[in-house]
């Protein structure tokens, strides 16, 4: 609420009229599980009304990367995973994304054997007119437009989704993905006051000690286990055989 005192507009999108919603500038009630539709509808309006941050998309995102008909990212060298290809507006040729003095296209001509990542995102958003969003989410079409306009024009803008929120529900990953696309498409990321914040606003917290007492013969140094290699380490008993696993306050 300190941000509100400094002039920020706070909008809460929540089926419930929570404590935060009561204090916000606007509360938008939404049908549970329909957040992805709202995000895609906002993306559609932003693109259709010239609110894309094109310089940001070209310089700082993979929106310009080319995708072939099989849905695979195109690369100059199959052995180099970072050699993504883009279509250069200046030379009218396919070049590496990190080549100098190029102007990568955000979209290419219809009928081309490839398309950009941005085109694929906008294709997903195309069916979601304000009216279609309203039918699915229960959010009035005028409110959908208002949200998209405010988010894309009143910069900096930030999305706070409170520790994953609907990410723990069915198709929640798509909802979070739509939020990140909103931030990237409008340049609302990587700058002060922007981004996607997954921190919570919890104030009622109880303090507990360790769930288990420390082992009496705990070694001084225990090698960490890389999250990405967790399965491999467990199956191989590496660095030690694992008979019991306890996870607290995080996912695996």
Residue positions per predicted region:
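Short secondary-structure boundary/capping segments
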Residues: 26-30, 43-46, 173-179, 211-214
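Long, well-ordered, tryptophan-enriched scaffold segments
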Residues: 4-9, 16-154
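Conserved acidic residues
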Residues: 25, 157, 243
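Glycine- and acidic
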Residues: 128-134, 160-168, 242-248
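Acidic/polar loop patches that form or flank catalytic/metal-binding clefts of enzymes
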Residues: 51-56, 144-145, 158-160, 187-198
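Extended redox/cofactor-interaction regions of prokaryotic respiratory oxidoreductases
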Residues: 1-11, 37-38, 100, 104, ...
């Amino acid at each position: 609420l300190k941000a509100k005192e400094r002039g920020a507009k706070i909008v809460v999108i929540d089926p419930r009229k929570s404590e935060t919603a009561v204090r916000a500038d606007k509360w938008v009630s939404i049908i549970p599980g329909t957040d992805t539709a709202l995000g895609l509808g906002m993306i559609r309006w932003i693109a259709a009304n010239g609110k894309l941050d094109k310089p940001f998309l070209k310089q700082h995102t993979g929106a310009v990367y080319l995708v072939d008909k099989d849905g695979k990212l195109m690369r100059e060298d199959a052995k180099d995973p970072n050699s993504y290809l883009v279509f250069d507006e200046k030379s009218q040729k396919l070049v590496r994304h990190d080549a100098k003095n190029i102007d990568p296209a955000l979209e290419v001509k219809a009928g081309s054997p490839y398309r950009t990542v941005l085109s694929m995102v906008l294709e997903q958003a195309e069916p979601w007119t304000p009216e279609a969003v309203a039918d699915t989410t229960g959010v009035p079409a005028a409110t959908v437009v208002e949200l998209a306009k405010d988010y894309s024009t009143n910069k900096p803008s930030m999305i706070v989704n409170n520790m994953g929120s609907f990410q723990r529900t069915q198709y929640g990953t798509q909802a979070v993905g739509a939020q990140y696309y909103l931030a990237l498409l409008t340049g609302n990321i990587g700058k002060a006051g922007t981004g996607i914040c997954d921190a919570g606003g919890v104030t009622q917290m109880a303090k507990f000690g360790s769930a288990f007492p420390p082992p009496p013969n705990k070694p001084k140094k225990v090698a960490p286990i890389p999250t990405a290699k967790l399965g491999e380490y467990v199956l191989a008993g590496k660095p030690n055989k694992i008979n019991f696993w306890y996870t607290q306050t995080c996912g695996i």
